[in-house]
Amino acid sequence: MMLRTFTLLLLCIWLNPGMTSLAVESQPELWIESNYPQAPWENITLWCKSPSRVSSKFLLLKDNSQMTWIRPPYKTFQVSFFIGALTESNTGLYRCCYWKEKGWSKPSKILELEAPGQLPKPIFWIQAETPPLPGCNVNIFCHGWLQDLVFMLFKEGYTEPVDYQVPTGTMAIFSIDNLAPENEGVYICRTHIQMLPTLWSEPSNPLKLVVAGLYPKPTLTAHPGPILAPGESLSLRCQGPIYGMTFALMRLEDLKKSFYHKKPIKNEAYFYFQDLKIQDTGHYLCFYYDGSYRGSLLSDILKIWVTDTFPKTWLLVQPSPVIQMGQNVSLRCGGLMDGVGLALYKKGEEKPLQFLDASSNTGNNSFFLKNVTYRDAGIYSCHYYLTWKTSIKMATYNTVELMVVAWPSSVFKVGKTITLQCRVSHPVLEFSLEWEERTTFQKFSVDGDFLITDIEGQGTGTYSCSYRIEAHPNTWSHRSKPLKLVGPAGFLTWNSILNEAVRVSLTMQLASLLLLVVWIRWKCRRLRLREAWLLGTAQGVAMLFILMALLCCGLCNGALTEEIEIVMPTPKPELWAETNFPLAPWKNLTLWCRSPSGSTKEFVLLKDGTGWIATRPASEQVRAAFPLGALTHSHTGSYHCHSWEEMAVSEPSEALELVGTDILPKPVISASLPIRGQELQIRCKGWLEGLGFALYKKGEQEPVQQLGAVGREAFFTIQRMEDKDEGNYSCRTHTEMQPFKWSEPSEPLELVIKEMYPKPFFKTWASPVVTPGSRVTFNCSTSHEHMSFILYKDGNEIASSDLAWGNPGGSTAHFLIISVGIGDGGNYSCRYYDFSIWSEPSNPVELVVTEFYPKPTLLAQPGPVVLPGKNVTLRCQGIFQGMRFALLQEGTHTPLQFQSTSGTSADFLLHTVGAQDFGNYSCVYYETTMSNRGSSLSTPLMIWVTDTFPRPWLSAEPSSVVTMGQNVTLWCQGPVRGVGYILHKEGEATSMQLWGSTSNEGAFPIINISGASIGRYSCCYHPDWMSPIKIQPSNTLELIVTGLLPKPSLLVQPGPMVAPGENVTLQCQGELPDSTFVLLKEGTRQPLEQQRPSGYRADFWMPVVRDQDSGVYSCVYYLDSAPLVASNHSNSLEIWVTDKPPKPSLSAWPSTIFKLGKDITLQCRGPLPGVEFVLEHDGEEAPQQFSEDGDFVIDNLEGKGIGNYSCSYRLQAYPDIWSEPSDTLELVGAAGPVAQECTVGNIVRSTLIVVVVVALGIVLAVEWKKWPRLRTRGSETDGRDQTVVLEECNQEGEPGTTTNSPSSASQEVSVELTVPI
């Protein structure tokens, strides 16, 4: 008999929570049933049961050969194989299998039937549930094949059993708690029949129980490292302190398939992986054990990554990306990989600034910059840093920009920011900052901190501050001592200086090497052989260095090439003027600046030639006022304003030019590109409200067009652009009342018609009315090939796409806004061009960003139900004036109609409506001058095109069958909104009316039900407009009051659980004759059925029941003499209609995207109560988890949680009936975008550099080997060194000089000696 030994070191791992189980692999269960104790061997049946799923076929095997198989009439969990009387021919080894989707399952455990009169030998195995240390809990399982056996556990050395059990099934579990060394030993299990204590089974195979953890734990290391690419080699070394042990290595994700043993001579073992694969990623550990299976502690877990791309890293700056000079800042770098080194890089520098080794990378890794200066400002990123070679590609990474604020220094650099701090020793109400060089400059602050940015190099100057206190808010203090901001202006940085120095140095080195080669060739063109190596080496080295330098320059240029990120520019603000003309047009002039961006913090007003005028914070309307007072000659000039956001300054607004104290500001004229034969609008912006506009053409004295007061701007229209309309245009503004005051003419606008390509096709992939944060893609396409595209917003270029190589026969470009902001709205268009010819502008797309203003109300006039062929007007009622409105229909991408209005509402006419106009409509309003910031969408309004109102439905809540005194609400429900309802009661002349309902439901509450409330009700629509459309009444509702008669009884035939398609009869038995019976179902507001039988019982027949007929039923009855006054409810009766219960739904929370190391809760929900849920994972034979509430927590330990899941459930009252599995739910891993690490050009350059370096090394090695031999020859002939030879060579090269020295003779000899060689 073979002795089976189990080491708890392994078994405690196998079933550790969160790990993959090795012991259970979806094996079926096989057991015996017989008619013992009367005749235990005369009627034997073998049962085979599937562990987790139903099957259509089952197979019985005997002695490794097929004996028989059964196909049941329907899928089931278990089947029986009848054996009959046990004879010699029936003895043997039995196993069974069941049919899965792709073949037969694993066979069951072996059942051995021996000769009659002896029970089968039980199966004996062991499991542990905690880590393998003394004190863990162990379960010993004994499987006895028969029901209701007595199980005995014996231990070697003991005559009596150490434990026994009488379980109800076929298996006993013997538990050993707090495992101790005294529990070691050999165990066996035997069984016998309770009624026949003398009939014993054969002893099971023995188990040797060994307590692990008796030896110290080994160390596990990886060579060359724990992170490698697929296809590379890995060596794992497990080293312990004791020689002669057997070492074992395992991967926790798949213990059964990745379990390795080695018995080396030394105290260490190497486990080799020659060709790594992605699936080799996981957590590895090792241990060792002696010949008696006494094991060591487990090594520390070693995580091995096999990946072709590093996961993405991220970088976070603390405390802020904007840091004051001299302070400390930490850059925290993180990623999915731990135990790997990290390196901090700064843009513009090749070498890393700092390193973090692998031991310190534990998830909270920070690089520290102390006493930051301007040199530390820049863009930083972090990467994984490995100390071994690997071919893993670098993934994408985020960058952060560190800005250094030069406080408290007073040295001001152009483009930098300084914080001026005004401080006093007592509380103040407000601080004020003045700039002596700008008399109109003034800033205010509550905390005394003023940020000064040196825009346009004008930040230097002398500043002072003052304050006021709350007790005297109108009195300001004396000014502080002045502070002067000075310093060199410019943008030179150490980085740029170093770059230039490197370039100059490289150029000088190349020039020096070239000069050296020329000099050697000129001075030594007649050198003898023993010095020839110097010339060859110098030339070779010089040329190799030149080639390497050029390659390095090319590599740097290629490596520093960055992908251009298209960022939406900060929209420029709008500037205008307000005054109280015509009474005093220049006595009280105020300039206003407004930004279309909702994130604007401050506004700055500037004047050409003077600079900074003033700064004002943004109001709630995202605007600011700059009062100038009475207009004087000092105010004349050109003004513009900027808006400031968190880290950006907008473009300047259009310039407003004040030209005199009695002349209106000069307007600004603009127009789109003129296209032959098409309409052209010329825009004239006049800065002030209530002005008249005039358009002039050069060469004509009178205006070509004039417009009255239409706001601050006017649009002149040329209906059809022709050659005669070309020329220079200008516009002027004037006051509306005499005496007229005119502005200066605007700058001229030249209109020239050019030959153009046809306009492109321009659209958005989804609706142009979007919510903040949405993704918007613009598609610009043309039939012309190889075109470049430009995207415009409000006439300004914001993005381009060069040479969009599309499908044959056309070109296409896609412009993407990943997350729309409130300032991204506007009018978008596109154009395409080739080398010299441009296309016409596309039709504009108005992108409206909603949820900035309150939603409007949409109403239909005369009503939402319209006869075919009639007109209907949809009125969109907003809140603010001067908005633009858009009408949308559900199912269409683009708005149906647009309207601009000076009021607060817009009317959209649907003319001669037909069936295609039926549907839901909504509307939105938005600003046209402020990036199309829009309102939320209105509540949808359904428009019905029909000659008859749809029939409403009347129901009662909570039910139409209620007890006396209860409150009930009658709901008249219909699909038409904005219509009144009328409620009728049978036998009464008056009706209840509900006018102008704004929802699609009308509620009629009835308080404290009494006898007067009992009756039959109906309802109908009651439109508040005159309409020939027909009105239909609703269904009739009977309001029944219960509790006045004895309750009936309710029975079901044939039973409470039936298969779909069968017939069911519900029998309601009352106690009084001449009654009407009412059948009710829980959850429904209306009775299901009513009957008036001749006797005391009503039979409610339900033919061909379906799943939806499942539920809780009850019944009541009432007498014909007192209708609708009913009895108490019968007892509730629950009915299940199922062959298989309906499949559940499976969802994931918070999402199906699985981040490594994070948990996901899978929620399995079914329609039936009192069930038990089971979760299955594709690739695993056995169910993974069971739950009564349907919640399963999946931890993605080692990345094993990813895959396809499904769930099912079974009824606790009917445990053999399982539902269909749910739809498959896939959990996927979060993966960042993979970035291409280097270009093909850089790969080629890098290869050439390697070739050059190798060639350089070979040349130097060859010459170095020649040098000692040449030195020896030279010393034998003339005994002089290299220096003397060079000097003589120089002398020989001089004209008129002869040399007869022995050295020269020796040189000649040396030359002659080498010729034969």
From Swiss-Prot:
Keyword annotations from UniProtKB, A to Z: Disulfide bond, Glycoprotein, Immunoglobulin domain, Membrane, Receptor, Repeat, Secreted, Signal, Transmembrane, Transmembrane helix
Compositional bias of kind Polar residues: 1296-1309
Chain ranges on the Cytoplasmic side, renumbered to this chain: 521-531
Signal peptide location: 1-20
Cellular component GO terms held in the UniProt record: extracellular region; membrane
A GO MF term: inhibin binding
Segments of this protein annotated with the region Disordered: 1290-1310
Keyword Repeat set for record: yes
Keyword Cell membrane in annotation: no
Cystine connections: 48-96, 238-286, 333-382, 422-465, 780-830, 876-923, 1068-1115, 1164-1207
Summary of the knockout phenotype: Mice are viable and fertile and show no alterations in FSH synthesis or secretion or in ovarian and testicular function. According to PubMed:23143598 male mice show diminished pituitary and serum thyroid-stimulating hormone (TSH) concentrations, reduced pituitary thyrotropin-releasing hormone (TRH) receptor expression, decreased triiodothyronine concentrations and increased body mass.
Ranges of residues in domain Ig-like C2-type: 21-112, 114-211, 216-302, 311-398, 400-481, 570-658, 659-753, 758-850, 854-938, 946-1041, 1046-1131, 1142-1223
SMART domains reported for this sequence: IG, IGc2
Extracellular compartment residues: 21-499, 553-1317
Glycosylated sites: 43, 328, 371, 871, 967, 1063
Cited SUPFAM superfamilies: Immunoglobulin (SSF48726)
One Pfam assignment: Ig_2
Transmembrane feature ranges: 500-520, 532-552
GO biological process terms, semicolon-separated: regulation of DNA-templated transcription
Function in brief: Seems to be a coreceptor in inhibin signaling, but seems not to be a high-affinity inhibin receptor. Antagonizes activin A signaling in the presence or absence of inhibin B. Necessary to mediate a specific antagonistic effect of inhibin B on activin-stimulated transcription.
Subunit details: Interacts with INHA; the interaction is not confirmed by standard receptor binding assays. Interacts with ACVR1B; the interaction appears to be ligand-dependent as it is diminished by inhibin B and activin A. Interacts with ACVR2A, ACVR2B, ACVRL1 and BMPR1B. Interacts with HECTD1.
Protein name: Immunoglobulin superfamily member 1
